[in-house]
């Protein structure tokens, strides 16, 4: 069971990294970042249950990471929406935000 969960977490993490590197759309990049965080959460819960199933430290930390990821997604989408309203595009390669 441990191997299957870790392999799934590695696949999710790899897909997220690949999508983040090759993404040209800001919304897609945010979704890939969320996929990476979910892969990390899966590994946290898996290791927590494998090493000591009586303590819920990994589960609690995973809930904390989910809360932080939700806040990050809300702030990220608000920034993308503001950029879209000003520039009418969400493509990453069209921007130099330091001049914005």
Swiss-Prot record:
The lineage of its organism: Eukaryota, Viridiplantae, Streptophyta, Embryophyta, Tracheophyta. It comes from Cryptomeria japonica. This is NAD(P)H-quinone oxidoreductase subunit 4L, chloroplastic. The gene is ndhE. Its main location: plastid. GO terms for biological process: ATP synthesis coupled electron transport; photosynthesis, light reaction. It is found in: Plastid, Chloroplast thylakoid membrane. GO terms for molecular function: oxidoreductase activity, acting on NAD(P)H, quinone or similar compound as acceptor; quinone binding. It is an enzyme of class 7 (translocase). InterPro entries: NADH_UbQ_OxRdtase_chain4L/K, NUOK/Mnh_C1-like. It catalyses: a plastoquinone + NADH + (n+1) H(+)(in) = a plastoquinol + NAD(+) + n H(+)(out); a plastoquinone + NADPH + (n+1) H(+)(in) = a plastoquinol + NADP(+) + n H(+)(out). One of its GO terms (cellular component) is NADH dehydrogenase complex.
